[in-house]
């Protein structure tokens, strides 16, 4: 999916939570879509021969991951027992990608339950 499609989906989800801010599935979808956008962006921006990102391109990916993290952390507060959504694994992926080992380990423990 190209960046424009990710952004269209995210905008639609954000409109939905303006109507119902407690709709956990939509909040989950925003977090997942942003996470997918970050992965796609990383693949798109990576140097084709080395697979590495420039500092500026890396920051673009980090910014999207941080936005995704915000939605998933909000969801963690709203649905702490993961009764409506399984937020632990995508949040683990984000913490891992951002290098937050302590929080990644915390999520990994939740995944073992």
Predicted regions and their residues:
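Structural marker of alpha-solenoid helical repeat scaffolds
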Residues: 19, 78-80, 113
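Short coil/turn linking the two alpha-helices of tandem helical-hairpin repeats
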Residues: 1-3, 31, 36-47, 97-100
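Short coil/linker segments at helix-helix boundaries
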Residues: 36-74
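Residue-level recognition of tetratricopeptide repeat
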Residues: 23, 82-84
